[in-house]
From Swiss-Prot:
Species: Arabidopsis thaliana (Mouse-ear cress)
Transmembrane segments: 15-35, 39-59, 71-91, 122-142, 169-189, 202-222
Domain writeup: Aquaporins contain two tandem repeats each containing three membrane-spanning domains and a pore-forming loop with the signature motif Asn-Pro-Ala/Leu (NPA).
Membrane protein topology class: Multi-pass membrane protein
Broad class of where this protein is predominantly found: endoplasmic reticulum
Motif (NPA 1): 69-71
Record-level Gene Ontology MF annotations: channel activity
PANTHER family attached to this UniProt entry: AQUAPORIN SIP2-1-RELATED
Pfam families with a match to the protein in the record: MIP
Protein name listed in UniProt: Probable aquaporin SIP2-1
Role description: Water channel required to facilitate the transport of water across cell membrane. Inactive in yeast cells.
Length: 237
């Protein structure tokens, strides 16, 4: 897929990702009638969330690289060459943000009673640290899964989905456990809070710095190990 195709795919997937989260909540709490305080309802919601992540993982594979999370685009851009980095930062990430904003606007138009998205419940620096730590681990895990089991779609998606869900639960009461600046930006834009210090530090600066740190850490720690493992293979051949 060419770069124009990737841009269009990013826009569509970002739009769909926001809608998917809302539809899961509507299905669990509206259609199935589970209370938001009912533990069994939360379990059902988590199951649907994992199914949703599998669907989007398949869509990413089917579109050969479509993304809906700016942090994934940033990690891919940093890991690639200079051209890839520029394309990710100045084209793909803005498009993913636009897709999220359009999705939230559409959701609010269709379901005016829908909530207002993630909310920060701790101090700004505490929130930035929380989102940063969650992001660091999920980026590190994603890169590790791509390298260690590149051909196993089910196993890679299963491990990644459980990890994302676990980290989301750990951070949900503090920052929402988002790990996706574009998704938060969509709701913040709808509330007129997209340029506040709280939003920029917690949901952008913290995760972006954590992503860069995770990519650097992975290259420094794991790449030499891979090279050492490749030497015996080269000798045997």
């Amino acid at each position: 897929m060419g770069r124009i195709g990737l841009v269009v795919t990013d826009l569509v997937l970002s739009f769909m990702w926001i809608w998917a989260g809302v539809l899961v909540n509507i299905l669990v709490h509206g259609v199935l009638g589970f209370s938001r305080t009912d533990p069994s309802g939360e379990i059902v919601r988590y199951l649907f969330s994992i199914i949703s992540m599998f669907i989007f993982a398949y869509l990413q594979q089917a579109t050969k690289g479509g993304l809906y999370n700016p942090l994934t685009a940033l990690a891919a851009g940093v890991s690639g060459g200079f051209s890839s980095f520029i394309f990710s930062v100045f084209v793909r990430i803005p498009v993913e943000v636009i897709g999220s904003i359009l999705a939230v606007k559409h959701i609010i138009h269709v379901f005016p009673e829908i909530g207002k998205g993630p909310k920060l419940n701790v101090a700004i620096h505490h929130g930035a640290l929380t989102e940063g730590i969650l992001t660091f681990f999920i980026v590190l895990l994603s890169m590790g899964l791509t390298r260690k089991i590149p051909g196993s779609f089910f196993m890679k998606t299963w491990i990644g989905s459980l990890a994302k869900l676990t980290l989301h639960i750990l951070g949900s009461d503090l920052t929402g456990g988002c790990m996706n600046p574009a998704a938060v930006m969509g709701w913040a834009y709808a509330r007129g809070e997209h340029i506040t210090k709280e939003h920029l530090l917690v949901y952008w600066l913290g995760p972006v710095k954590a992503t860069l740190l995770a990519v650097w850490f992975f290259k420094v720690v794991f790449k030499p190990l891979t090279e050492e493992q490749e030497k015996p293979k080269a000798k045997s051949e």
